[in-house]
Amino acid sequence: MANKMKIHLEADYKTFTAFCPVYRPGGQLAAVEMLTHFAHAQANVVIPQEILIPQLNEHQRVLLLQDQINIIEKHYAFFSSHNINVAINIDERLAETILGSDFLIKKMNQLDCIELEISESFPDIAGGKNNPCLQGLSQHFHLSLNNYGAGKATSKAVFDNLFYRIKLDRGFIQHNIKRGSFPPFISAILDHIKPHCHAVVVQGVDDISGLQSIRHFAFDGIQSALFPPVNEEGLSHLLDPPYLLQQPVLQ
C-alpha cells in the first residue's frame, strides 16, 4: 500500500513501506527491517531506497524519516506487545540530522522498538567509539550493523560494543557457505563477535539447503529471501512461525 508522501526530484515518486522479517532459529519473530521503496508516479518503475535516498536533500530526508516514524508509531502497540524491534536504515547525513535535533531524539526514544541500521560504508566506522557520530548514536539508540563481513571496515566498532544487532553480509555468506572450511570459519566468527552484541543475524541464506546448513550454528536470527517482506496490513502474519523453521534440523 503506497503512502501519501510524495517526493519530487526529476520526477514525482510515491513511497510505500515493507517490513522484512528477522526470525529466531525456532521461528519466533525477533525484528523487522523497515524498507521504503519509491514508485514512479507515471511509469511502472519501483526504485529501492538505497538508490534514491542519496539523491534527497536534507528536507526530503527529514520528511521521509518523519513518515517512517509515523508508521512505526501507528503500529507501536503491535511492536511493543510482541517485543519486536524495527530497524530504520540511515546514512551519515541522516545520522547527523538526528543527532542535531532534540525533537527527533525525544520522539524516537518514545518508540523504544526503533533500531538505527548502518552499513560498513558508514564514514570512519573503523574509528569505533572514537567516531563522535557513531558514539552519539549508540548513546541514544540501539544500533544495527547491516553487512558485517563486506570487507569495508575493521572490527573496532564491534569490539567497542557499539552495536545491539550485527547482521552478517549476504554476499559474504553466499560466497563461503558451500566451502568445506565454512563450519569452523563461521563458528570462529560467531565466537569472535557474539560477546560484543545482543544478537547476530545471518543473511543471504536464500535456499532450503543453505537454511539447513546454517541452523547448526549459534545464530540469533535469520533474514532470508525465503521469508519475504510484507506491507503494513500483513504485519500480523509475520507472527506465524515459518514452516521451514519448524522442521527438524537435519544431522
Task: Describe each model-derived feature in a short phrase.
Residues L145:
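Pre-DFG segment of protein kinase catalytic domains
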